Amino acid sequence: MARSNRRGGRGDPEDDPAWAPPGHRCAGERAVGGPTVIPRAYLPAVPAGGNESRAFQGRFVDPWFSGIRTGYVIWDGGRLLGVTRNEPEHADVIDVDGIICPGFVDAHVHVESSGLRPARYAEIVVREGTTAVVWDPHEVVNVSGELGLEWAVKTAEEALPFKFYIALPSCVPALGPPYETVEGEITVDVARKFASHPMVVSVGELMDVAGVMEGEKDEFIELKSLYGLTVDGHAPGLTGFEAMRYFAAGPETDHECSTAEEFTSRRELGVWTFVRQGSSSKDMEVALETLEDLRGVCFVTDDLHVKDMDEISLRKIVGRAIEAGFDPLESLSAVTLNPSLCYGLQSGRLVPGFHADIVVVEDLDENMELTDVWIGGKRSERVRFRDAEAELPDVELSVDPREVSFQDGKYEVRCVGLVRGSIRTEEIVREITVKDGAVKDDDVAFLVVTDRYGQGSWSIGFVEGFEELDCAVVSTVAHDSHNVVVAGRRLDDVRRALQLVSEVGGCVGAVAGDRAEFVRLDVAGLMSSSDPEEVKKSYEDVLELIRSSSGVDWDPFQALSFVTLPVVPELRLTDRGLVKVEPDEIRFVDIITDGDPVE
């Protein structure tokens, strides 16, 4: 595919105003509600003068303008004063080798998916140049409702100078009764309580596609005009007229693109297009093959587990885009300027009044090697981040593991088919044999979901795609209601895995006969309070048990955690049963196609 327009850069936007999506706004300006003014509690006052200011001297880049400029980037405390060609009179000047860039902004994350508390998450990503994220905390909010949202917003205050901008969860529960057992609920009245908070920047992803098109989410969408919030979309599989209907209702972004057709559709509609590269969804390759440029594009990690943070970061994603032939400034824009414009942030640019978050790289090339990171006007290694304390509920498993059973026989069943590298699943109909409480067919395992909220509900089905899984894997991270999910070929192992959760509470783990390994998730059954290195070590012990008992050499937990999500096509299992998910309809379907054993 020809891409001759890439290397030339796009020039000054004042000369080319069409580069941004329709309805784009200038940095620091909300869609309708006016400027995004961060109160003095969150940004130091601009000094009248003195000797407290500091400046970098060297080459710098703000993607709003074309090319690399030379001069001074000046800040005082945690706030940028601006850039200039002239040496400042009242500033401590630091000569810099390399290129000075704005701190990177991840436009869509679920911090809970890291398995870490937010402060520990921030410590890791800031080393790679990420100084701000737009956090949709709907994982913890699904578990604990308004209490979880209050904790997230309080954490956004406590964690400064790291910026946890908040997207207000708009679909909690994602689906709810009768399709799944849930605990948390966020009504629009609850959302309004937090909508004017200075760290709240958007209405979180609107996952109820049919509800959006039918006007059932209008009250949440109206928060856009009432509070000047961006509205985040979630439209997997929608193209053509259906995509038009959905985005015409109000959503402005989409992070669910995973096919060339979807990426093309979003660009044609002028929707902010997010490209995911995380632990679960890896859409970068398709995006780089499809997109002609990166105007209106943001790179995001979405769900990124601690074990993958050494390999996946915004810095490396930008480098990959440059290596693929995209213009370096456009690639940098996808983690700086574009998120800033999309959400009206005071991050992502080197302009007066914005946060003094600065990244220095050796060059804008495929390596994007970091030489320095400053956050809130301080070197990152000198900053310690905090998060808020809260009594968030742990897992309450009331199902007796001995109750979980399935009659021996040969059946034609609907299997939840895994799609490697994607959170989507397929409906696969096939014959299977259950004998002595074990599935005898290659690449098929039992799938069991029990509620975590003490209601005692559970269901059993089948999953295809875990290969020769010869143990049981269990997780209390199960999107989005976070009930307990287990996969295993033998019911004895499945029961032992449920017993493990009953004994230790929230965790991810593996059980093979008498052996068990797990990572304790003591914060809402989603996150660990332990040191990140300890979490990674325990997680590796779990994976080693899976490898040694099964020969499975890939991480099954990201796939396992999404087989329960009943708002993404095509087939999902919840604690209430098997759910068929289509763009215009969600319904229960039978696990056994004819209701009786074949033999």
UniProtKB/Swiss-Prot annotation:
Task: Report which superkingdom the organism of origin falls in.
Answer: Archaea
Q: In this entry, which stretches build a coiled coil? A: none
Essential cofactor(s):
Mn(2+)
Choose any GO biological process term that the UniProt entry carries and state it: adenine catabolic process
Keywords, in A-Z order: Hydrolase, Manganese
- Pfam families associated with the record: Adenine_deam_C, Amidohydro_1
EC numbers listed for it are 3.5.4.2
Q: Kindly list the GO molecular function terms attached to this UniProt entry.
A: adenine deaminase activity
Q: From the UniProt entry, list the residue stretches annotated as the region Disordered.
A: 1-31
Per its record, the protein catalyses:
adenine + H2O + H(+) = hypoxanthine + NH4(+)
Report the family membership: Belongs to the metallo-dependent hydrolases superfamily. Adenine deaminase family.
Q: What is this protein called?
A: Adenine deaminase
The organism encoding this protein is Methanopyrus kandleri (strain AV19 / DSM 6324 / JCM 9639 / NBRC 100938)
